[in-house]
From Swiss-Prot:
ATP binds at G8, Q9, P10, G11, S12, G13, K14, T15, T16. Its main location: cytoplasm. It comes from Pyrobaculum islandicum (strain DSM 4184 / JCM 9189 / GEO3). The keyword Nucleotide-binding applies. This is Cytidylate kinase. GO terms for molecular function: ATP binding; CMP kinase activity; dCMP kinase activity. InterPro entries: Cyt_kin_arch, Cytidylate_kinase_dom, P-loop_NTPase. GO terms for cellular component: cytoplasm.
Length: 184
């Protein structure tokens, strides 16, 4: 029962890497970010405002976390999200963290979301600070402590294909050793 958790900073490539890992391993992908965005849209609240709302309403995070934990317990899943690894570490075979400089992530986000670089950079910095405070107060998790991760990958100067290849090489090697069979 394989469980892989992929976490990382906004714009680091975590969603794209997680999607490809899930495809290659033929596992479902569960994304806490998309669940969070869905909840924001359903409530008709701007994404950043929803982060602020969630900071005051921990039930939002708890709902998403409970869903992630249940999927991890069931096994055979790739979980993706900012806190995925911290939340499901007891059930995960492998935890990967992707990071990149704030400027590079802002550039990626500005292209992805069709917004100015300046707006994306402001949003990245604001979102990170909101997340840092919320996770520290709600979970007592310091998102700068990466000790729960098996692999920390700086994607600043990697193409997305390089980030995927490195992640899959690591995953396939570890799972092959752990389960004594070929995974990829």
């Amino acid at each position: 029962m394989v469980v892989i958790a992929i976490s990382g900073q906004p714009g680091s490539g975590k969603t794209t890497v997680a999607r490809e890992v899930a495809r290659v391993l033929n596992l479902p992908l569960v994304s806490s970010g998309s669940l969070f965005r869905e909840l924001a849209a359903k409530m008709g609240i701007d994404f950043i405002e929803f982060h602020k709302y969630a900071e005051k309403n921990p039930d939002i995070d708890k709902v998403v976390d409970s869903m992630a934990i249940e999927r991890a317990k069931a096994g055979n899943v790739v979980l993706e999200g900012h806190l995925a690894a911290w939340i499901v570490r007891p059930y995960a075979d492998i935890c990967i963290y992707l990071k990149a400089s704030s400027e590079i992530r802002a550039r990626r986000i500005s292209i992805r979301d069709k917004k100015s670089f300046e707006d994306a950079l402001r949003e990245v910095r604001e979102r990170e600070e909101l997340n840092r405070r919320r996770y520290l107060s709600l979970y007592n998790i310091d998102i700068n402590d990466l000790s729960v991760f098996d692999l920390v990958l700086d994607t600043s100067y990697l193409s997305i294909n390089d980030a995927i290849r490195i992640s899959l090489d690591y995953i396939c090697t570890v799972l092959g050793f752990k389960y004594s069979r070929k995974f990829c």
